[in-house]
């Protein structure tokens, strides 16, 4: 095929605009900074990955340590699953005294 008859190929790579870093230079990664830590936790209470967070390896390690410290000190729950504790409304409650066998 001649060079003149070749079809033009578009590049397959798309350009993505660079987003600002999620952690500013003034932000301290600490277990007491709940507003910062809560941005890196999913709705279920799981720690989000580096790809999702757009953090460096060092920042991700510090965030993980801070989240684990906050969980141990009960500042942050281990699980965030409200559906587990909700009682279904379709089950009727039994009326009357309960009988125990001794």
UniProtKB/Swiss-Prot annotation:
<dbReference type="Pfam" id="PF01084">
    <property type="entry name" value="Ribosomal_S18"/>
</dbReference>
<feature type="compositionally biased region" description="Basic residues">
    <location>
        <begin position="1"/>
        <end position="19"/>
    </location>
</feature>
<keyword id="KW-0689">Ribosomal protein</keyword>
<dbReference type="InterPro" id="IPR036870">
    <property type="entry name" value="Ribosomal_bS18_sf"/>
</dbReference>
<comment type="subunit">
    <text>Part of the 30S ribosomal subunit.</text>
</comment>
<dbReference type="GO" id="GO:0009507">
    <property type="term" value="C:chloroplast"/>
</dbReference>
<dbReference type="InterPro" id="IPR001648">
    <property type="entry name" value="Ribosomal_bS18"/>
</dbReference>
<keyword id="KW-0687">Ribonucleoprotein</keyword>
<dbReference type="GO" id="GO:0006412">
    <property type="term" value="P:translation"/>
</dbReference>
<feature type="region of interest" description="Disordered">
    <location>
        <begin position="1"/>
        <end position="26"/>
    </location>
</feature>
<dbReference type="GO" id="GO:0005763">
    <property type="term" value="C:mitochondrial small ribosomal subunit"/>
</dbReference>
<dbReference type="InterPro" id="IPR018275">
    <property type="entry name" value="Ribosomal_bS18_CS"/>
</dbReference>
<dbReference type="GO" id="GO:0003735">
    <property type="term" value="F:structural constituent of ribosome"/>
</dbReference>
<comment type="similarity">
    <text>Belongs to the bacterial ribosomal protein bS18 family.</text>
</comment>
<keyword id="KW-0694">RNA-binding</keyword>
<protein>
    <recommendedName>
        <fullName>Small ribosomal subunit protein bS18c</fullName>
    </recommendedName>
</protein>
<dbReference type="GO" id="GO:0070181">
    <property type="term" value="F:small ribosomal subunit rRNA binding"/>
</dbReference>
<keyword id="KW-0699">rRNA-binding</keyword>
<keyword id="KW-0150">Chloroplast</keyword>
<keyword id="KW-0934">Plastid</keyword>
């Amino acid at each position: 095929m001649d060079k003149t008859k070749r079809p033009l190929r578009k590049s397959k790579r798309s350009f993505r605009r660079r987003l600002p870093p999620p952690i500013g230079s003034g932000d301290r990664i600490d277990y007491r900074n709940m507003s910062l830590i809560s941005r890196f936790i999913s709705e279920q209470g799981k720690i989000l990955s580096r790809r999702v967070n757009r953090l460096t390896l060092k920042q991700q390690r510090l965030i993980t340590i801070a989240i684990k410290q906050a969980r141990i000190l009960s500042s942050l729950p281990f699980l965030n699953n409200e559906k587990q504790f909700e009682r279904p409304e379709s089950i009727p409650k039994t009326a009357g005294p309960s009988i125990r066998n001794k």
